[in-house]
């Protein structure tokens, strides 16, 4: 009888211990992203989150990323049909997130009200850029302009001024000196093609894009490769480059400059939780972490800008944050400046396939390296 009592006590102790461990694990022990966001950013974000989860939540989280260009990532999510191999989709145009939500392939983010309310509904005029989904299926994480990257010494040798506006890329002296990624392969290129079409109208816009292709010496396989070939001095300028990709080359020691022309599209780097995600609690915790000052600092130190007016890019003299401010023209927050935007999400969504088809027929099919 005494042995039975000891055995029962042992079972009760084990049950209580197990319950205690469960109570101390508020989130799952794994998190996987599928993302076009470069390793430079997503590795830092995942590492910072894992440290935060251990420190603040008492949880050991194994973090993983599936790198994929935006069109490829979108296609894989559709193919998974609600049984995803990742928990989160991060990066690209918000129009794609809207399409995934329509197909019921996203679940609502359902983060805390404080975190949700810290992000304004939109930014920019005359066309506001949504910074979060009105129906709650995605949320912005950082502001990222798509602009022009250039090699100052090569530009100087060509005898032209440093580019400031999109039209500067059409200078005849830049023939064969521009690098870009096809809009069929890159969301930043696709969005910037949309900007040009919105600025000039369909006919004049395509004329402009054809002229750009005549100055293009290389169509890269990925948008990430555009600043790399410019930084190495293989080309003088790059079109539709995300700010952080250019800054990564600057940190690597290359002589490279960056400018966001008027009407440069500013993406909120959307993030969403996939329907059927195996680790939804960890996914929500990751999103909430990224919206804290600690999470936003991951971006602010790497050439991106805060998604909330609460924070500004700043740091000690000589810090990477201050280097980023200088590199991006003195910008500390996009909420402190006028943001001119002509990109229309509804038009972009409707025109998406037609744009890609016309690019293939009017530019890709006839392009020859100058």
Residue spans for each PLM region:
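A structural signal for short loop-to-beta-strand junctions that line the ligand-binding cleft
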Residues: 84-89, 107-149, 167
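Conserved C-terminal helix/tail region of periplasmic/extracytoplasmic solute-binding proteins
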Residues: 332-370
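Short helix-initiation/N-cap motifs at beta->coil->alpha
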Residues: 66-75, 95, 167, 213-228, ...
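Ligand-binding pocket segment of bilobal, Venus flytrap-like solute-binding proteins
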Residues: 194-260
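Early extracytoplasmic/lumenal segment of secretory-pathway proteins
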Residues: 24-99, 227
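Short beta-strand->loop
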Residues: 34-37, 132-143, 150-152, 158-159, ...
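Mature extracytoplasmic/periplasmic domains
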Residues: 274-340
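Ligand-binding "clamshell"
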Residues: 100-108, 133-134, 248-260
């Amino acid at each position: 009888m005494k042995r039975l009592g000891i055995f029962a006590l042992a079972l009760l102790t084990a049950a209580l211990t197990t319950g205690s461990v469960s109570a101390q694990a508020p989130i799952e022990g794994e998190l996987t992203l599928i993302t076009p966001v470069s390793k430079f950013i997503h590795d830092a974000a995942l590492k910072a989150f894992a440290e935060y989860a251990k420190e603040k939540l008492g949880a050991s989280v194994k973090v993983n990323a599936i790198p994929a260009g935006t069109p490829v990532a979108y296609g894989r999510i559709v193919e998974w049909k609600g049984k995803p191999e990742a928990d989160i989709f991060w990066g690209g145009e918000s129009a794609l997130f809207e399409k995934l939500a329509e197909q019921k392939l996203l679940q609502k983010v359902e983060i805390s009200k404080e975190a949700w309310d810290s992000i304004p509904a939109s930014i920019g005029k005359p066309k506001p850029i949504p910074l979060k989904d009105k129906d709650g299926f995605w949320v912005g994480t950082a502001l990222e302009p798509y602009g022009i990257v250039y090699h100052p010494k090569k530009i100087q040798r060509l005898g032209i001024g440093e580019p400031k506006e999109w039209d500067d890329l059409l200078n005849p002296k830049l023939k064969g000196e521009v690098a870009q990624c096809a809009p069929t392969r890159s969301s930043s290129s696709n969005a910037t093609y949309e900007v040009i079409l919105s600025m000039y109208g369909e006919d004049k816009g395509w004329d402009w894009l054809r002229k750009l292709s005549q100055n293009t010496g290389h169509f890269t396989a990925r948008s990430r490769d555009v600043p790399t070939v410019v930084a190495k001095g293989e080309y003088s300028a790059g079109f539709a480059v995300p700010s952080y990709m250019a800054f990564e080359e600057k940190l690597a020691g290359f002589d490279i400059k960056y400018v966001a022309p008027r009407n440069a599209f500013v993406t909120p780097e959307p993030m969403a939780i996939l329907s059927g995600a195996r680790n939804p609690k960890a996914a929500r915790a990751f999103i909430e972490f990224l919206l804290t000052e600690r999470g936003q600092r991951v971006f602010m130190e790497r050439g991106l800008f805060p998604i909330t007016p609460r924070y500004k890019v700043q740091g000690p003299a000589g810090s990477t944050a201050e280097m980023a401010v200088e590199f991006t023209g003195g910008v500390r927050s996009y909420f402190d400046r006028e943001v001119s935007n002509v990109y229309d999400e509804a038009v972009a969504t409707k025109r998406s396939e037609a744009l890609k088809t016309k690019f293939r027929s009017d530019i890709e099919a006839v392009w020859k390296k100058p």
